Amino acid sequence: MNVLLIDVDQKFPNLALMKISAWHKKKGDAAGFNVNNPDKVYISTVFTWHKAKALGMANFYKSLGCEVEIGGSGIDLKKTLPDEIEHIMPDYSLYGIRYSIGFTSRGCIRNCPWCIVPKKEGSIRNHAPIDEFYVPRWRKLILYDNNFLASPKWYENLRELIARKIKVSFNQGLDIRLINQENARLLSKVHYYDDQFKDRRLYFSFDLLQIKDQMLKGIETLEKAGIPRSHLMFYVLVGFNTTYGEDLYRLNLLMKERVLPYVMPYNNRHDSYYPHLARWINRSVYNLVPWEEYKSGNSQEIIKELEVK
């Protein structure tokens, strides 16, 4: 059987497609992004703004007589892979990557109104052991757990990451409200990195002003455990239910605490304010130009130099 895989988003490696590829190749099928004369087509999109494009592709391949499967969070939050595909070693050669990706847990203990996880995955639970998706010779792992520190096996999994000296990126973010002396001590021994495996990085979020005190306590606890503030990055949701003033307050507080902020506009919002704010923060322009000066347009030469770099 010839199996064509289509990643509509093409923003980052699609884990579901890698598992589908592995399953079909195990059966002896030809599977990939450039398969001619397909008998079956899998189309996946994570983002809702690509839904129309994905549905258009599905209709096209159906008109050619192909069997078509379409899925992903952008299409159907409840659709999941069959267990025999979900729990297979992903085909990392599909994207030519040399790091592993996976979930040790699914779901979350929170119920944030902007997040699809509660609707998609429900309450937190164990999902898979690290060895199910980890390739030891690479020693690099990106964990997609939505709330790793709340998972039933967080302690065992941290101990395993430490013992095996795995370079890991918690790029979905850890919950700063759950930081305590015990997990901070273990995290200090983990080989944690950003998702490029270049800089030492632990990711958190500061989406709610109400968690300010817990956040400050968490930062202090991590620092006391030996984790430098420069290793901490906080995602900051903007454009959901906050004012401009509240957004700036949270960002300025993070800068004052000497940790790294990273702006995340809600649902990819493109109001003129949000792209400017994201550029000012995410490209570290704030280290050179105050916000008031930046938004007034009086720092365009500096901005152009940064964009060239």
Feature names for model-found ranges:
Residues 13-14, 69, 77-80, 125, ...:
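Charged phosphate-binding loop/patch that engages nucleotide di/tri-phosphates or the phosphate backbone
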Residues 1, 67-105, 109-140:
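N-terminal [4Fe-4S]-dependent radical SAM core
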Residues 20, 53-61, 157-158, 183-187, ...:
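A general structural detector for well-ordered alpha-helical segments in enzyme core domains, enriched
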Residues 1-70, 75-77:
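A short, structured N-terminal alpha-helical element that caps or precedes a catalytic domain
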Residues 12-13, 50-52, 76-80, 110-111, ...:
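Short catalytic/ligand-binding loop motif for oxyanion handling, primarily in non-cytosolic enzymes
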Residues 196-201, 210-309:
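A structural motif corresponding to the C-terminal lobe/cap of the Radical SAM core domain
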Residues 5-9, 42-46, 116-218, 229-240, ...:
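Core AdoMet radical
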Residues 25-30, 60-70, 84, 162-169, ...:
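Structural alpha-beta junctions
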